[in-house]
Every structure is written in C-alpha cells, then in structure tokens.
Design a protein with these regions (language model features):
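Domain-level signal for soluble alpha/beta catalytic cores
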Residues: 1-263
Length: 263
C-alpha cells in the first residue's frame, strides 16, 4: 500500500528583504525604547515568515549579515586589515538575545570568513591574516551560542579545506552555493551532512562510495526531486531545505506544504 512520506524542513537563511516604508515605521514604533537598526529589522524579518510557516529548524540571517560582521570588526579600515583583528561583540550578542527570545533552537547564517573579502596590510602573510580572522569568527560564534543561538551556517561559493578544518563542527555547518564535484568533496571531507539542489544529486550519489554521507538537505525540492533522493537515501536521512531570496511568506509556506510525497 502506498503511503505519505514526510520530511523535516530546515532553513539555511534568507536574503535581506526591504519592506515598504510603512512596515518599517510600524516596526520601529513597536520597538520604541529598545535599541535597534536596519539590520535588526532585516534579521527579524528573515525569521518571522519561517516561524509562521512552521519550519522545523529555522535560521535567521543570511549573506546580508556581513554588514554587521564588518562593522563589528576591530583592526580594519574599509575592507583592509590595518591592525590586529578583534571584534566588538555586544552588537552580535544583542542580535542573538533578541532572536533567541523569539525562537528556541534557532540557527544563524552569515558569510564564511573568506567571503567577506578582507585585504591584509598588517599581518606577515595571508595565512597569518586568515587564521586571525578564523579566531575572531570562533569567538563571535561561541559568544552568540552562549546567548541562545543553537548553531551557525556559514555561506560560501568555493569552500576551502583550511577554513572547514578550522571552523566546521557539530554547531557550524558550511553551505556552498556552487555545487561541483570539487566543492562537494571538500565539504564532505569535514561534514557528513551536505546541502544541495536536485541537480547535484547525481554527484552526491557518485561520492557516497568514498564519503560517509549521513544526511542530505535538498534545496528547493519538488516532488520528482524527493522521489529521486529516496532512491539513494532513506527518508529519515533526507531534509527539505531552503534559502529564501524573494517573497519569503510564500516561499517558506510552499516549502512546508511540499515536504512530503506519496510512495
């Protein structure tokens, strides 16, 4: 007998969506007396549609959060490192506290270290500079977890082995927007869960003989994609995932509605 197979849903974050002026004014009025800025508005706006849609593992933030990261860094002028790197932690802690008070078991997304594009004019060489940035990232993420954030999703286009070795772990997940055999191999070398679109399922199947692929987060999956994924992994090892770029109210609701198939 055929039955419905349902999948858990997981967010990998969202792009920043600017609502009309009236929505922003109303939001500011509701927060009167509480410290906030446009980034606060954007991260809350990225989260609320996920909660309303019933995403199992929501995630605030996205690539746009790099503006907060950059403004919080010590030792830079523009995007150039000119002194020892450090971080002004309180703005990040405020974001973490605000969001953790809205949603438990919440993850947070922002760009991986190399994606923010810093140039080095202080450290002896580029390796010393990037490892100093890794240290700052560890401090930022640990501090946010101490305030209630469950974990972080680091977005990248081209994952780098040294970066995953330094940062990937149970509470830090790397998501690559470019899916090639090489990028997937680098990811799977350090994490047993991978997020891909359906077009990369063939690559994943080929790599399963070499790597321990425990779970697949299938991005923007349709019914045919889920049936295809079920040919290579059992349902409990598949998750419907998404990264919203537009019309997030509809996007997340649609993802939840389509997170099942008849089999």
């Amino acid at each position: 007998m055929r039955k419905r197979v349902s999948f858990l849903t997981r967010s990998l974050g969202s792009d920043a969506l600017i609502s009309d002026r009236e929505v922003l004014v109303e939001w500011v009025r509701a927060r009167r007396g509480r410290e906030a800025d446009l980034i606060t508005f954007q991260i809350e706006g990225s989260l609320m549609p996920q909660i309303e849609a019933g995403i199992n593992t929501p995630c605030a933030g996205g690539k746009f959060y790099q503006d907060r990261l950059i403004s919080s860094l010590f030792g830079i002028e523009g995007r150039t490192i000119t002194a020892e790197l450090g971080c002004n932690i309180p703005p990040l802690l405020k974001d973490a506290e605000d969001l953790a008070s809205i949603q438990k078991d919440l993850w947070f997304a922002f760009p991986a270290p190399r994606e923010i594009g810093l140039c080095n004019r202080f450290y002896h060489d580029s390796d010393e500079a990037i490892y100093a940035l890794y240290s700052v990232y560890r401090e930022m993420m640990r501090s946010m977890r101490d305030k209630g954030i469950s974990g972080h999703i680091l977005h990248c286009d081209n994952p780098v082995s040294e970066e995953l070795e330094a940062l990937a772990g149970r509470r830090v997940f790397f998501f690559s927007h470019i899916e090639t055999k090489k990028t997937l191999e680098i990811l799977l070398e350090y994490q047993a869960t991978v997020a891909v679109r359906s077009s990369a399922l063939g690559l994943i199947e080929d790599l399963m003989d070499e790597y321990d692929v425990q779970k697949i987060i299938l991005i923007d999956s349709r019914e045919d994609d889920l049936h295809r994924a079920l040919e290579i992994k059992d349902a409990e090892h598949l998750i419907c995932g998404g990264y919203c770029q537009d019309s997030c109210d509809f996007y997340w609701k649609s993802m939840v509605e389509n997170a099942s198939v008849i089999r």
